[in-house]
From Swiss-Prot:
Keywords: Carbohydrate metabolism, Glycoprotein, Glycosidase, Hydrolase, Polysaccharide degradation, Secreted, Signal. Belongs to the glycosyl hydrolase 51 family. It comes from Penicillium canescens. The keyword Glycoprotein applies. It catalyses: Hydrolysis of terminal non-reducing alpha-L-arabinofuranoside residues in alpha-L-arabinosides. Pathway: Glycan metabolism; L-arabinan degradation. Residues 1-17 form the signal peptide. One of its GO terms (biological process) is arabinan catabolic process. This is Alpha-L-arabinofuranosidase A. Pfam families: Alpha-L-AF_C, ASD1_dom. It comes from the Eukaryota. One of its GO terms (molecular function) is alpha-L-arabinofuranosidase activity.
């Protein structure tokens, strides 16, 4: 039998001694989802990041917002490239292709997402071709100086009036010295009818997490697995909403074969392929043991709102999505899920309706009819699903929960430690986007003139730790918390800071100072008592099993004037009990983990022993995050 409790003490702005006594019973039980991840297509975190596809602009997808183009592509061998919208395209979803015309060796090269990582491993690729051609294709990975790391011949199956897929593998013999590499695809144009061929959906994947086809980048998934998130909030974020109602994220256009996914204009300045679609998100949840999700709520970022009389079709779309995810194979959309390789339904316990509907002039319609329409329909058909509003700025019906977002300066995170103390547990809150983004300035964030840090920095991360302890202290009211945004490609980003930063070289991936703070947190809470009055009530973690009897204490020290002496006792723990005390610090308050740089977070673990009356005595330095675990 397993019983879990949680204690998370806050130590802030004091240097006097602190005495803490931890009780055995009482406290608040969490949802078990206390910390999670948030993903939306921003910062090329999916396209060019977590989604392992190496070819940028692989299918020339475009929209009225971002028209089709030849970004990342260059002609090879003096050939010419031209975009085509043929009468018989690869598919209606992918109508635009590239025509390569030349004489002799001709082709196309791609620079990837600002580089392609090359190392001794198998790369799996494919491309579609239309046109009469009796020769062969050459696919290769090359350095910018022309050095060839791997090359293979692909016999042509191309015909005049149809699109034919060709597959290949590449296995370099050595690792490239940098990621300044290209993928090159060539053919002998003299053997092609009219000296030209049409190409589309040119793809190349490295080995993926769990070797899933169309899968995820291994180093980023490893960083996420090491963090251990318990839920995934997706697909946004603003990207869920779209700039217009028609431009919203449509779940049914992100499933099925890649040839049937049209892609869409993100709200962050570029087109996405939808290669990382609903099923891939759910497989991500499966692989890391996380829970989902969000649905669209009838609001676009441009302020357009679906009128009440027209909302039913969008509510039905949300129900169809839930049927696709959870329905039996006897249902219409459950059968479609099975067709796409997942006969076993997924379990959905939470659905968030929309994103930040208190913004973009959306709150009035959200309160008056939009949220209620989704809430009523979902709870009627799926009574075991908890429906969350995308704001807490409204009166919530039934058992609905809310979502609260906080981007702020570190000092304001400290002042918000107790903000949930008086909040009702009848409507639990998801802290769906949380981050210290800007240095202390005595005021807060001016959203018309922001000065966000490139990376999380140590002072901000410690301030986040303080706020998180306040959230865990109210664990009966808080469903879970996630940093946001989570990922950033340093070569092309729209928002910083993020939990994890990266470029095309997996060796350069940086787990931020905030990653290290979040990595320390637990799940269930138990009150503690203290004879000191330095701040809010203290909390502790205790875990009992048939084989172990352990306790965990956690603390964050923010802006103290000197080391803080701590005397800690756990009820039932006596003299001589040993514990491991791990203290996280950094060289300075502005220390940060940069892409390609060393980890600045210093972790020191020491063994300590309880003295008389079971007292653990130790000191915590300023700007530290600590964990004590009894043995």
């Amino acid at each position: 039998m397993l019983a879990e409790y949680l204690l998370l003490p806050l130590l802030a702005s004091y240097a006097s001694a602190v005495t803490i006594s931890v009780a055995k019973s009482g406290g608040n039980v969490t949802t078990g989802l206390q910390y999670g991840a948030m993903e939306e297509e921003i910062n090329h975190c999916g396209e060019g990041g977590l989604y392992a596809e190496l070819i940028r602009n692989r299918a020339f997808q475009g929209s009225t917002t971002y028209p089709s183009n030849l970004d990342a592509w260059s002609a090879v061998g003096g050939s010419t490239l031209s975009l085509q919208n043929l009468s018989n395209p690869l598919s209606s979803a992918l109508p635009t292709s590239v025509r390569i015309t030349g004489k002799g060796t001709s082709g196309i090269s791609n620079t990837g997402f600002w580089g392609i990582d090359v190392r001794p491993q198998k790369y799996s690729g494919s491309f579609y071709v239309k046109g009469s051609y009796k020769g062969s294709f050459t696919a290769s990975l090359q350095a910018s100086n022309g050095e060839v790391f791997a090359s293979t011949q692909v016999s042509s199956k191309s015909v005049a009036n149809d699109w034919v897929q060709h597959e290949f593998t590449l296995t370099p013999k050595k690792k490239a010295s940098s990621s300044n590499n290209t993928f090159v695809l060539t053919f002998d144009a003299s053997k092609a009818s009219g000296g030209s061929l049409d190409f589309n959906l040119i793809s190349l994947f490295p080995p993926t997490w769990n070797n899933r086809p169309n899968g995820m980048r291994r180093d980023l998934m490893q960083a996420l697995q090491d963090l251990g998130p318990k839920f995934l909030r997706f697909p946004g974020g603003n990207n869920l909403e779209g700039q217009t109602i028609e431009g919203r994220w449509k779940w049914n256009e992100t499933i099925g074969p890649l040839t049937q996914r049209p892609g869409r204009a993100t709200t962050w300045g570029y087109e996405e392929t939808s290669g990382m679609g609903l099923v891939e998100y759910m497989e991500w949840c499966d692989d890391l043991g996380m829970e989902p999700l969000a649905v669209w709520a009838g609001l676009a970022l441009n302020g357009d709102v679906v009128p009440e009389a027209e909302l039913d079709v969008y509510v039905q779309d949300a129900l169809d999505e839930l049927e696709f995810l959870t329905g039996s194979v006897d249902t219409k959309y459950g059968a479609l899920r099975a067709k796409y390789g997942h006969p076993k339904p997924w379990t959905i316990r939470y659905v968030e309706v929309g994103n930040e509907d208190n913004l973009s002039s959306g709150l009035s319609s959200y309160k008056s009819y939009r949220f209620q329409a989704f809430y009523d329909a979902i709870t009627k058909k799926y009574p075991n699903i908890q429906v969350l509003a995308s704001t807490i700025d409204m009166t919530l019906p039934g058992n609905a929960g809310g979502d609260y977002h906080l981007y702020d300066i570190p000092d304001n995170f400290i002042t918000k430690f107790g903000m949930f103390d008086s909040y009702s547990d009848a409507h639990p809150i998801l802290l769906g986007e949380i981050a210290a983004t800007e240095y202390n300035n005595g005021v807060g964030i001016d959203w018309s003139n922001t000065h966000f840090s490139l990376y999380p920095w140590w002072l901000g991360s410690v301030a986040e730790a303080v706020f998180l302890l306040g959230a865990e202290r109210n664990a009966d009211k808080i469903i879970g918390t996630t940093y946001a945004p989570f990922l950033m490609n340093l070569d092309s980003y729209e928002w910083s800071p993020t939990m994890i930063s990266f470029n095309s070289n997996p060796d350069d991936t940086a787990k931020s100072t905030s990653w290290h703070v979040y990595n320390n947190h637990m799940t269930n809470t138990l009150p503690a008592t203290s004879n000191d009055t330095f701040g809010p009530p203290l909390l502790c973690h205790r875990c009992e099993t048939a084989k172990t009897n352990s306790h965990i204490f956690k603390a964050a020290v923010y802006n103290s004037t000197a080391d803080v002496p701590v005397s800690l006792t756990f009820e039932g723990v006596g003299r001589g009990t040993t514990a491991d005390l791990t203290i996280l610090t950094a060289p300075s308050d502005v220390s940060m983990n940069a892409v390609g740089g060393a980890n600045v977070v210093q972790s020191q673990t020491t063994k300590i022993k309880a003295g008389k009356q079971g007292v653990f005595s130790f000191k915590l330095p300023n700007l530290s995050v600590a964990v004590l675990t009894t043995n």
